[in-house]
Amino acid sequence: MFSHLPFDCVLLLLLLLLTRSSEVEYRAEVGQNAYLPCFYTPAAPGNLVPVCWGKGACPVFECGNVVLRTDERDVNYWTSRYWLNGDFRKGDVSLTIENVTLADSGIYCCRIQIPGIMNDEKFNLKLVIKPAKVTPAPTRQRDFTAAFPRMLTTRGHGPAETQTLGSLPDINLTQISTLANELRDSRLANDLRDSGATIRIGIYIGAGICAGLALALIFGALIFKWYSHSKEKIQNLSLISLANLPPSGLANAVAEGIRSEENIYTIEENVYEVEEPNEYYCYVSSRQQPSQPLGCRFAMP
């Protein structure tokens, strides 16, 4: 079971690595400027990190077909029609492409090279270029409100009175458009930050699970080794105890059994003779040592 754990951890990390980049689609028309947002938050003011923009999806390392690159201080490489519109010193590394054509369609990679292993933030932004729409030039409408102030006529018993309310305030469409763009960029930046944070949390969780499984495997191997060593040690101690048993005890036990069998007997001999009617008998006591002479008693009639 444990042999499959390292392989599963590698697959999990590869899956998280491949799904790290996000893809968002943006549209523009031929002849317009295309805007591809990309943001990050510097750790401290002026503490910048390298950023690269490339044509094509984000590879495992760096950017492919680099069109713009920054370092910790300034923009050190760019090609024509590609430039940064925002303040990159504050983390705004959004790319602007001037006067786009149909050939500019495709996926662009924004890679924020944060120091550390697998800490880079990768964003794949799909740019779709549409042909320009042919529309008649709009005629400029005259602001009649500004030219003719509103008149309020009151009728009463006396002569009619005319009051001037003044012209309505002009609405600056340029300011409204700029505000809408800023709100859109802010919303996109928040979405990108949330996506990056979610992916990073997923990677940390996967790495933690792999580390926990590896530690469990190591502890299991150590416990198994300790158990085997303890069992072998107990067997060795048992053999040593049997080998160290005093031989005298075993020999004494055997000799005692033999001696008991030899000493428990009685020699009785009766001699019946016509010529000598005397009888005699001998006995051996169980307490008498084998080396002592036999004790015999004679009985006379």
From Swiss-Prot:
Outcome when changing residue 272 to A: Abolishes TCR-induced NFAT activation
Similarity comment: Belongs to the immunoglobulin superfamily. TIM family.
Disulfide partners: 38-110, 52-63, 58-109
Subunit note: Interacts with HMGB1; impairs HMGB1 binding to B-DNA and likely HMGB1-mediated innate immune response. Interacts with BAG6. Interacts (phosphorylated) with PIK3R1 and PIK3R2. Interacts (not dependent on its phosphorylation status) with FYN. Interacts (in basal state T-cells) with VAV1; AKT1/2, LCP2, ZAP70, SYK, PIK3R1, FYN, SH3BP2 and SH2D2A. Interacts (in activated T-cells) with LCK and PLCG. Interacts with ILF3; this interaction promotes ILF3 ubiquitination and degradation.
Alphabetical list of InterPro entries matching this protein: Ig-like_dom, Ig-like_dom_sf, Ig-like_fold, Ig_sub, Ig_V-set, Immune_Mod/Transcr_Coactivator
Illness: May be involved in T-cell exhaustion associated with chronic viral infections such as with human immunodeficiency virus (HIV) and hepatitic C virus (HCV).
Binding site for Ca(2+): 116, 119
GO molecular function: metal ion binding; transmembrane signaling receptor activity
PROSITE patterns registered for this protein in UniProt: IG_LIKE
Protein name (record): Hepatitis A virus cellular receptor 2
